[in-house]
């Protein structure tokens, strides 16, 4: 009888915690690695974690968190103190990120306002395939499943990734600045990204690639979906 009471108490406590998190506006992100290699996941906020194939890292965003971004790092080595480096996506040589990652890196971006806004971004280039899956089945689940590294133009290639034209050439046209801020059409380079991943943000003014979902939705971010 005592065992039954104990189980009932644990179930009630778990439910209470879950309800409290929902009421408090906590948004949960499950970061999953389905790649056939290790990915060092990174998040702002969140920090970072090594994910071997099949592993998941959960990040809970506190109520009032206006925005977040997540990405995967590859080719990393870290010492026992969490210091090291990554071939792509490195964030100041730290396992637990407190600054944005080095380009190129595929990004999952999230903004909280009157509702949730999110996108898969290739504006900073590409390193690994990525998808965002909302728990709300009525919301779009954008993905970039292609290996853009395989079709990357030589002038954009770096070890382990494919840079954006803005990062490489730094011109107003490619970066949608100054005279191009209000009228910035796609370029031959951004079209390569768009053709490979139609649901992803291919350059700074590719606004059709932003998606919305009701507040209170949780998400999974999948590397190599």
From Swiss-Prot:
Keyword Cytoplasm recorded: no
Tissue spec: Expressed in pollen (at protein level).
Cysteines joined through disulfide linkages: 35-224, 76-86, 91-97, 139-213, 144-197, 152-162, 166-175, 176-184
Applied relevance: Extracting this recombinant allergen by vacuum infiltration from the plant (Nicotiana benthamiana) apoplast via tobacco mosaic virus vector could be useful in diagnostic and/or immunotherapeutic strategies for cedar allergy as it is a more convenient and inexpensive method than expression in the yeast (Pichia pastoris) secretion system.
One Gene Ontology term from the biological process aspect of the record: defense response
Alphabetical UniProt keywords: Allergen, Disulfide bond, Pathogenesis-related protein, Plant defense, Signal
Protein name, UniProt field: Pathogenesis-related 5 protein Jun a 3.0101
Species of provenance: Juniperus ashei (Ozark white cedar)
